[in-house]
UniProtKB/Swiss-Prot annotation:
The modification Phosphoserine is found at residue 114. Residues 6-110 form the FHA domain. Its main location: nucleus. It comes from Mus musculus (Mouse). It is found in: Nucleus. Its EC number is 3.1.3.32, 2.7.1.78. Residues 110-142 are annotated as: Disordered. Plays a key role in the repair of DNA damage, functioning as part of both the non-homologous end-joining (NHEJ) and base excision repair (BER) pathways. Through its two catalytic activities, PNK ensures that DNA termini are compatible with extension and ligation by either removing 3'-phosphates from, or by phosphorylating 5'-hydroxyl groups on, the ribose sugar of the DNA backbone. Changing residue 48 to A: Abrogates phosphopeptide recognition. The modification Phosphothreonine is found at residue 122. One of its GO terms (biological process) is double-strand break repair via nonhomologous end joining. The gene is Pnkp. The keyword Phosphoprotein applies. This is Bifunctional polynucleotide phosphatase/kinase.
Length: 522
């Protein structure tokens, strides 16, 4: 067994459902990883000796040297045979061709100094103790006052108790509004209780055994526009005015915690209710971002600015009401959900259309991909074409369309099949590759990825939440593509056009599938 460092050891973490942790030698010995049982990688593009790793526990870094032919990636840097890179804690090593991620982690020694704590999802040795019964999940007691967690603030007032049912509320526009009458508060004290009926209703809920919770998005804190301490003071003043104990969860950044994504609810259920299960059916969420249409009630001419609160309730499965419906007993107003519903997406359905065509050609050809950033092009191409021997040409990797053309021409001269993995929105961007095919005397086909802009934006948000190494794609880029887009036609010179519907990957981890099917933008 390798000697442990003075404080712990470095290890590599696979995605959920992947192989077990890979511990790195702490004595300077090299560890070679590649295709094999340790990584559970069977892709023949990955060499059995793909990378050499040398861990340095003192600096908590790992030197990575590529041994295999196909590229490994360290963080955002793609390696070549014989070249090296360095991993720091939290960095991701992609074993080959941007696939099979392994994240560098550090494991502290236990306080006893005899055995380090097991990493997440790693079972302990049953022989280490006499009692081999499964250990009970640790119950975390809620701390009174404020806690600053990663991209999340949590406040627990005195008197808050764990309960099996929750009455949860948005803050601005639901429990309070501006005293000035303006849309946004002009100062920390520019607020008042939205309706006089609210305090009494909250007292009734508390008496009925509900835990009272506030879920609020406050992106201004993460952007540095709203000082956290100022907002904390405002929350405490509001709670004092309401007169009942609340637990408050504040999302300060985009991502998993920001409504409508369910991260704040997940934290409440898993970390902030002292192990008491919460009945979703017996709970409720109240919010004003409900997707209501213009003129949704007499005197209410403006449509809702967002649907995030209603979508948050949908994601969690909570009964939902607006403040007017809940506190004033107004009838339900008409509303509209987003055009794209991620709950409808699955791994079923045709891989491509028409199904009578062949996805792959046995002979040299050029395949030109067309589709929004986030339409699923690269994943599909890597999984189905590159794995079958097609040469992958990508502008993000090569840097310019001129280099893409040169790479395409070089591959065709070698009798290779080529796939152009760019967005290619218009006729001129596609024509250069059609010309490459004509010059080489080979056919050119188009793979048109059918994801709409709404779905592509959803896909990009999903990638940002699940892959820290993925560069965000701005809305400006997305709308620019939509403006440039010209549907591909056979008249351009394509032999065939295949339509590629977006499908979830069949091997996607169930937890990631659940996350993908959540609404992620209001």
């Amino acid at each position: 067994m390798s000697q442990l460092g003075s404080r712990g050891r470095l290890w590599l973490q696979s995605p959920t459902g992947g192989p077990p942790p890979i511990f790195l030698p702490s004595d300077g010995q090299a560890l070679v990883l590649g295709r094999g049982p340790l990584t559970q990688v069977t892709d023949r593009k990955c060499s059995r000796n793909q990378v050499e790793l040398i861990a340095d526990p003192e600096s908590r870094t790992v030197a990575v040297k590529q041994l295999g032919v196909n590229p490994s990636t360290v963080g955002v840097h793609e390696l070549k045979p014989g070249l090296s890179g360095s991993l720091s804690l939290g960095d991701v090593l992609y074993l080959v061709n941007g696939l099979y991620p392994l994240t560098l982690r550090w494991e502290e020694l236990s306080t006893s100094g005899s055995q380090p704590d097991a990493p997440p999802d790693t079972p302990g040795d049953p022989e280490e103790g006499e009692d081999t019964e499964p250990q009970k999940k640790r119950v975390r007691k809620s701390s009174l006052g404020w806690e600053s967690l990663k991209k999340l603030l949590v406040f627990t007032a005195s008197g808050v108790k764990p309960q099996g049912k929750v009455a949860a509320f948005d803050l601005d526009g639901t429990l309070i509004t501006t005293r000035s009458g303006k849309v946004f508060p002009t100062s920390p004290s520019d607020w008042r209780i939205l309706y006089p009926e609210i305090p009494k209703k909250l007292q009734e809920l508390a008496a009925e055994g509900y835990k009272l919770v506030i879920f609020t998005n406050q992106m201004g804190i993460g952007r540095g526009k709203l000082p956290a301490e100022v907002f904390k003071g405002k929350v405490e003043a509001v709670l004092e005015k309401l007169g009942v104990p609340f637990q408050v969860l504040v999302a300060t950044h985009a991502g998993l915690n920001r409504k409508p994504v369910s991260g704040m609810w997940d934290h409440l259920q898993e970390q902030a209710n002292e192990g008491i299960p919460i009945s979703v059916e017996d709970s409720v969420f109240v919010g004003d971002a409900a997707g209501r249409l213009a003129n949704w009630a007499p005197g209410r001419k403006k449509k809702d600015f967002s649907c995030a609160d209603r979508l948050f309730a949908l994601n969690v499965g909570l009964p939902f009401a607006t403040p007017e419906e809940f506190f004033l007993k107004w009838p339900a107003a008409r509303f509209e959900l987003p055009a794209f519903d991620p709950r409808t997406i699955s791994s079923a359905g045709p891989l491509y259309l028409p199904e009578s065509s062949s996805l792959l050609s046995p002979n040299p050809e050029v395949v030109v991909a067309v589709g929004f950033p986030g339409a699923g092009k690269s994943t599909f191409i890597q999984e189905h074409l590159v794995s079958a021997g097609y040469v992958h040409v990508n502008r993000d990797t090569l840097g310019s369309w001129q280099r893409c053309v040169s790479s395409c021409q070089a591959a065709l001269r070698q009798g290779k099949r080529v796939v152009i993995d760019n967005t290619n929105p218009d006729v001129p961007s596609r024509a250069r590759y059609i010309q490459c095919a004509k010059d080489a005397g080979v056919p050119c086909r188009c793979f048109n990825f059918c994801a709409t802009i709404e779905q592509a934006r959803h896909n990009n948000r999903f990638r940002e939440m699940t892959d820290p190494s993925h560069a965000p794609v701005s809305d400006m880029v997305m709308f620019s593509y939509r403006k440039q887009f010209e549907p591909p036609t056979l008249a351009e010179g394509f032999l065939e056009i295949l339509e590629i519907p977006f499908r979830l990957q069949e091997h996607l981890d169930p937890a990631l599938q659940r996350l993908y099917r959540q609404f992620s933008e209001g």
